[in-house]
Amino acid sequence: MADDVKRVVVWSTGGIGALSIVAVQERPDLELVGVWVHSEEKVGKDAGELANGVPIGITATNDVDALLALEPDCVVYAASGPERDAGAIPDYERLLAAGVSVVTTTSTTLINPMAYVPDHRVRLEAAAAAGGASIFASGIEPGFLCDQLPLVFSTACRSVSKVHCYELALYDDYGVEEIMIDALGFGRPLDFEPWIMLPGAIAGEFQGQIRYIADGLGVEVEDIRETYDRRLTDQPIDTALGTVEPGNCGAIRFQAIGVVDGREAIVIDHITRLARHVAPDWPIGEADLSYRVVLEGKPNFECWITPTLDDPAEAGIPTMGSGAGAMLATAMRVVNAIPYVVDAQPGLLRSLEMPLTLPRHAVRAS
């Protein structure tokens, strides 16, 4: 990996984008040269003030040509929205074709390009080849805890019979209606049919992770099964979206299950509640957001992970509760990867073929 300073543009000043701005500014091997914003109200404002209230002398813009003229080596792409890929693919194509590498938290299924939407993959491969650039998607989940980490544990195994990864979360402070209600079905009675109930929705969203693990272990996935269950609350729950009354959905559980040799061998298991009292018979995390990775084999491995952040306000995300540590970890998965992605061969990258994206200049007193 080359030691030269990489020029960076951050795309969006939402939670992940804001954290990325601060992180890039701290790194002597990275130089923040520009920031893209969607809202006209943010255009012309100091990007540092938008991120965490501290001016940095870089003016936010929505002019892509102006940002490309800055000759960045890489863009940290952190835009969000209900139709993420639909909006992001044209941006990725333009950046890659211009010779700018991309690290992204937006397109979660791109963590495994081999299982990405074929049309999107072909378009991105062509753009990357034309510009001689690379694109890499990551995050904490997906992108690390329930896909890369199990493979790390497997390096100490003689045999592996099953991989089971859990995300155990309390989402009472998450106030995005199109996700919480429309997609997941929280706060609604059982006759409400959210997006996640559509046949193939869960398998489609998580097949990349399952195939990533299978590729790493050298096995073939014969089928991907899916399950979805929900439980009603029997008492009112105060949430960021208002009060959820008794008789409405207060917890959901969904699984994507990879079948290998006729067995359910790889399981991604998400259990999400609005309050800890709902569905007490389901596994409960050690904290409001926890992850559990279980490998059954020789030897067995079980690991609990709870990402936390002592001072979310200092980090620039004062309204975040239990998810603050995970949000920062998501940002750092791509920020730390920047030098490796810029120096990689052109194309669509995944962690399986990359070196560990170890952070440089991260060891300090605080």
Feature map (PLM): residue ranges:
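C-terminal active-site/capping subdomain that shapes the small-molecule cofactor and substrate pocket
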Residues: 238-366
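Alpha-helical support elements that line or immediately flank enzyme active sites
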Residues: 144-155
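Active-site-lining helix/loop region of Rossmann-like oxidoreductase modules
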Residues: 11, 154-283, 287, 291
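Short, ordered loop/turn segments at secondary-structure junctions
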Residues: 38-40, 81, 100, 106-110, ...
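N-terminal glycine-/serine-/threonine-rich beta1-alpha1-beta2 phosphate-ribose binding loop
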Residues: 1-98, 218
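Gly/Ser/Thr-rich loops at beta-strand to alpha-helix junctions
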Residues: 14-16, 83, 109-112, 116-117, ...
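Conserved active-site and cofactor/substrate-binding residues in soluble primary-metabolism enzymes
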Residues: 11, 15, 19, 62, ...
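Rossmann-fold NAD(P)-binding glycine/threonine-rich loop
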Residues: 89-90, 98, 106-133
